[in-house]
Amino acid sequence: MLSILKKLFGTANDRTVKKLFSEITKINSLEPAIQKLSDEELKNKTVEFKEKLKNGATLDDIVYEAFAVVREAAKRVCGMRHFDVQLIGGLILHRGMITEMRTGEGKTLVATLPAYLNALTGKGVHVVTVNDYLARRDSASMGKIYNFLGLSVGCIVGGMPDEVKRAAYNADITHATNNELGFDYLRDNMKYSLQERVLRPFNFAIIDEVDSILIDEARTPLVISGPVNDNAELYGKIDKIVRLLNASDFEKDEKLKTINLTETGITHIESLLSKENIIKPDTSLYDFENLTLVHYVNQALRAHNMFTVNVDYLVREGKVMIIDEFTGRVMEGRRYSEGLHQALEAKENVKIQNENQTLASITFQNYFRNYPKLSGMTGTAMTEAPELKDIYNLDVVAVPTHNKVTRLDLDDEIYGSKKEKYDAILKLIRDCYDRGQPMLVGTISIEKSEELSSVLNKEKIPHKVLNAKFHEQEAFIIAQAGRFKAVTIATNMAGRGTDIMLGGNPEMLIEQLDKEHNYEAKIAEIKAQIAEEKKQVIEAGGLFVIGTERHESRRIDNQLRGRSGRQGDPGKTKFFLSLDDDLMRIFASDRISGVLRTLGLKDGEAIHHPMISRSLEKAQQKVEGHNYEMRKNLLRFDDVMNDQRKIIYEQRTEIIKSKDSHGFLNSTTEELAKKIVLTFMPVGSYREDWDIENLSVELHRVFSIKFDHNVVSKNDVTEEEITKTVIQMAHYIYKSKEEAYSSELMHNAMKYILLTTLDQVWKDHLYSLDHLRQGISLRAYGQKDPLSEYKREAFNLFEQMLNNLKELFIQTVYHFHIDLKNVQKEDVSLEYKKLQKNMRESREDPAFSKYNAGSSLETDLKPVVSRIDPKDRNPDDPTSWGRVSRNELCPCGSGKKYKYCHGANE
């Protein structure tokens, strides 16, 4: 019934596209008039549009004319005219939706339409892509159109200085990678003045390869971190011990990606740990004193049994580097958390880096939800449409191709073993190579690509390998994959964003030329050669895409297929599978094995059966559903931190903007004074129960007040009067500082102390949340909802953090002093700014993890309570410890956290 209705009325997508086509006629009707404009008149249209917006017009009022102007500019500058389907894609993007357009349909050109239109507001547009190469390429090629129309263009890539980034972000249209945008947002919220920040307020983002960024990378948060405890030696020792375990000592679940010691395994590892003097004889791994070792053992087990080199990570230049499972690319600057990365470094016998503590983090899910208006484009989004709608409130519209797709998608071939599968692939590659048909062979990992490469080397078949190890050559290799007799092996979607043109890409070959010798003649020669090869390739059948395995996601398989048949070109695709493949083995092997036994599969023989295809699709849907739930669950937990992050970042901005910090100082002084007095002089208590001695100690610790006991000797004194006296004394101390140092210097000092203190307590809070998150799932065994428990405890920790902020701020303000011996009064402000600058620069060093007001201003700005090097602390003398973070291990050596030991009463 549903299929009949769809035939009669079309799908919702068909109806949307039909409606959009009716709007395209309005743009096309403007083309003759726009074509008659001179270059100068066309450029002046930008000024005209801005004036209309200034006078109250909306973007929708000028959308058709603006699109017509961009189309004409693209034709004059780049020789490219937007097709009607590209105009439809532009309207979809402008309206805050995702457009699904096949590979080769010119998505980069489509983005110029909404980017230009929305940039007219002057609030900036971000065009987001997945790597530096694409950001540079698109800003250079499409930037010509924007510049022609009088708009500025910026490009953001890794390693740029802040001044260059700031200028790029201030441009009308900025091309940037998703990673740099996220990290710049985090870095900006660690800066100490608004002038240092590089980003403008969020406005509109167009995300290229939107499925890759919003779905594939959603599970991996961006993290800025600093090193903590040096446990490298322990990781090394545990690694050696784990290598001695037998297969029966642990059990793993590949579906859930978990691993646990068995009873025999626990006994075995306890014996090994005891021999190495890591635990005491006759103690258990799970005794309280040894509990921290469980974490090291578990991570070493995971490193050796759940993670594979050249599949999950690779080792390059003595470093373990994570491979993105969806793209096959190295994830630069990313490290596994919770000690897993250190365990992998121990496994691979490279230098073990210190464990990191989170200083700032955000997921792409929460970063991109900051934009008031968000859109995206990709070749494959319909399979993930429900998730994109649910999480980002983004609708997906599939746009028809400009030319009819002539690509032929052949049925899968399934073999009993990997060897039989490779034999069949090799035979097909040999046949295609002999007739000159180019091939793109997709693998799911570096390991598999190198495995296949060695097979082709033995057969003496020339080929190129494209994987994370050769990232720099990625675009060039993939661009030439359509040449005559070309054989290219690629991991997943490596090279995504670069078209494969039949016969080859002449522009990239021309870029390789030496401009000094016969440049023009060589260009003509290359173009002639490419044209000839294109004819030969079309005669041979176009690009043949071979999939060596099904991916967990149907979308990734569709992306691989989409590399062939661009813009109506001929082509073929085919997947080769075996029962040894990961997807088949883990998720679908039993069902499919039964079918194959029934059908009587013989060695070297392929099978085609609709039941097998359905089983594979069900397996993929099962994994997609599992991954979706993981991303959704991550978002639920991250939303808790995100709400707190927004509050902290907003407060930080308010502090930086503030012209006067006295309000916060006075209110916090009064709040703490009341709290301290009531702690030692409870309401309704008898005078003899008052603890005046400890009240005096606490007032000196917090406010630097020397409290006179005689004040309390009066019979009629009350706690309210004591509180009032304390507040007056605190105000007097502050006033004295202000008179000594100047009100401007005190304001700057207070602002800076408040910012550094906020950074310190926020960092400690993130550390606490990390630990809370790690163990919260165990609450389910106690019939409690882990998410509800996490929300409740995270809120309590946040309140505690705010209380710590107030106390540390007050303590530092009332205790610090500035040495003015060598500073003239009128130069104090300048001197302080210089000191402040030095301090900030140390903050920006990612290796710097200890935020406290006294670190870099040791001679000029000295808080009484400073952090002491742990090596200089005497366990038996608490006065030698300095300030101890509540989450540090207590310096007394008890093994407990400070807040549960000597700091329990603080």
Swiss-Prot record:
**Source organism, top-level taxon:** Bacteria
What is the enzyme's main class?
Answer: translocase
Give me the comment on cofactor binding.
May bind 1 zinc ion per subunit.
Q: Which GO terms describe its molecular function?
A: ATP binding; metal ion binding; protein-exporting ATPase activity
Provide the residue span(s) of the region labelled Disordered.
Answer: 862-887
PROSITE patterns with a match to the protein in the record = SECA, SECA_MOTOR_DEAD
Residues binding Zn(2+), per UniProt: 890, 892, 901-902
Q: Which Pfam families match?
A: P-loop_SecA, SEC-C, SecA_DEAD, SecA_PP_bind, SecA_SW
Annotated localization:
Cell inner membrane; Cytoplasm
A Gene Ontology CC term for this entry?
plasma membrane
Reply yes or no: does the keyword DNA damage apply: no
Asked if the keyword Metal-binding belongs to this entry, the reply reads yes
> Which UniProt key words apply to this protein?
ATP-binding, Cell inner membrane, Cell membrane, Cytoplasm, Membrane, Metal-binding, Nucleotide-binding, Protein transport, Translocase, Translocation, Transport, Zinc
What cofactor is needed? Zn(2+)
Subunit (UniProt): Monomer and homodimer. Part of the essential Sec protein translocation apparatus which comprises SecA, SecYEG and auxiliary proteins SecDF-YajC and YidC.
Classification via PANTHER family:
CHLOROPLAST PROTEIN-TRANSPORTING ATPASE, SECA INNER MEMBRANE COMPONENT OF SEC PROTEIN SECRETION SYSTEM
Name it: Protein translocase subunit SecA
